[in-house]
Amino acid sequence: MPRFVDRVVIHARAGNGGNGCASVHREKFKPLGGPDGGNGGRGGSIVLVVDPQVHTLLDFHFHPHVVAPSGKQGAGSNRDGAAGADLEVRVPDGTVVLDEEGRVLADLVGAGTRFEAAAGGRGGLGNAALASRSRRAPGFALLGEKGQVRELTLELKTVADVGLIGFPSAGKSSLVSTISAAKPKIADYPFTTLVPNLGVVSAGDHTFTVADVPGLIPGASEGRGLGLEFLRHIERCAVLVHVVDCATMEPGRDPISDIEALEAELAAYRPTLQGDSTLGDLAERPRAVVLNKIDVPDARELADFVRDEVAERFGWPVFEVSTVAREGLRPFIFALWDMVRTYREAQPPVVPRRPIIRPIAVDETGFSVHPDGQGGFVVRGTRPERWINQTDFDNDEAVGYLGDRLARLGVEEELLRLGARPGCAVTIGDMTFDWEPQTPAGVDVQMSGRGTDTRLEQTDRVSAAERKIARRERRQSTDEPGGEE
């Protein structure tokens, strides 16, 4: 069973908004109590929250479906439905959120950082909220909006100041375990380290973090071995350290060729966070070289021989280190701290964001109408599509209310301007219907009363006046001679 997972695909489904309620107030001696249907509750959203106690995406590996609760339906007596609780999902520090097309949506760094992965749907209005002077007792309510459904990719990128890179069995894990309290798995065979290991290093009164990245091989930037997974974890490192094994050199290999091979892989790798200007490109970040395992006599001789050549060729500081004899570690640690401190001092000061008391207004009144190439038209826009989803098409009065809203927005006038004819197919969102214009362009649309809509040829709703006439006719029929006794 995997214990460390750094890339998962999750299916986030936010909660749906609750439907509004259509009800009439009933009380003794109050025959015209008026509408009292409550609004539906808001659906719960899915929020990703950085938790320092979480270090892997393992939970999502077994449970990729994340579902937030939906809002409750409104009720009579002006009772609003309960809102669905937001679902807070804990993720590790350094998690990057990508959409289905690979675009970066969020870079979650720092404890408590939040990102709304999927927004909950808004609750539908009850008939009490829909009442107006011309529609005093609406016989319908609006449906709740569907919650947002998204497929997101989560990638964990290690957050460390220094990244140790090198070929397998170069001694990176031994080095990080010696200069910090980290206890990675150490063995004398390649690819012992399969997951990044983090360690906190003390340099006097200062501390910084070091990441032991699993071994790299030529072709890692193209996915050979586990290269792409390994290279992902050095994107955030401000300083990169080449760890070279001077004790077990193979024929045709030397420290300089090893460094050049790894640099070629770093140059070919295209990080996900290409827009992170604070760190810059991988090729621009400061480097250092560690000639490791100098406790072996042949390794010390090789390190002394190539040290000046490496420094002259690459222009980076070079350190001869032995983790077994704990030789050369102190100057190496303080040199790393100087490089990390230089990076930190170059960063712009963090300016706290001012809280937004009044959110920025978003213009949702815009819409567009385009021919579909088959004699029909397609209407696109935030409001029209939302209104379609909120309409109960089994209720004639709700359909009439939708027509009023679309006409007031100008959709009908725009269709007439583009040459739409009665009976042509009009598509809004997921709904396609035959369009029948009821008002000429430029005429204000008057809201219809309860149970009546001039655009409907027939309605199954019986008005109060019709019921009164029916009762009068029944009484007259019983009073006539020969009627029921």
From Swiss-Prot:
Necessary cofactors: Mg(2+)
EC number: 3.6.5.-
Gene Ontology process terms (BP): ribosome biogenesis
Record SUPFAM superfamilies: Obg GTP-binding protein C-terminal domain, Obg GTP-binding protein N-terminal domain, P-loop containing nucleoside triphosphate hydrolases
Residue stretches making up the OCT domain: 359-437
OBG-type G domain ranges (all copies): 160-341
List of residues binding GTP: 166-173, 191-195, 212-215, 292-295, 322-324
Disulfide topology: none
InterPro entries hit by this protein: G_OBG, GTP-bd, GTP-bd_Obg/CgtA, GTP-bd_prot_GTP1/OBG_C_sf, GTP1-OBG_CS, GTP1_OBG_dom, GTP1_OBG_dom_sf, OBG_GTPase
Cellular component, GO annotation: cytoplasm
Binding site for Mg(2+): 173, 193
Region of interest (Disordered), residue spans: 439-485
Localization per Swiss-Prot or TrEMBL: Cytoplasm
Composition skew (Basic and acidic residues), residue ranges: 452-468
Any matching Pfam family: DUF1967
UniProt domain Obg: residue ranges: 2-159
Keywords: Cytoplasm, GTP-binding, Hydrolase, Magnesium, Metal-binding, Nucleotide-binding
GO molecular function, one term: magnesium ion binding
CDD domains per record: Obg
HAMAP family in the record: GTPase_Obg
Family: Belongs to the TRAFAC class OBG-HflX-like GTPase superfamily. OBG GTPase family.
Subunit text: Monomer.
Record function comment: An essential GTPase which binds GTP, GDP and possibly (p)ppGpp with moderate affinity, with high nucleotide exchange rates and a fairly low GTP hydrolysis rate. Plays a role in control of the cell cycle, stress response, ribosome biogenesis and in those bacteria that undergo differentiation, in morphogenesis control.
Protein name, entry field: GTPase Obg
Gene that encodes it: obg
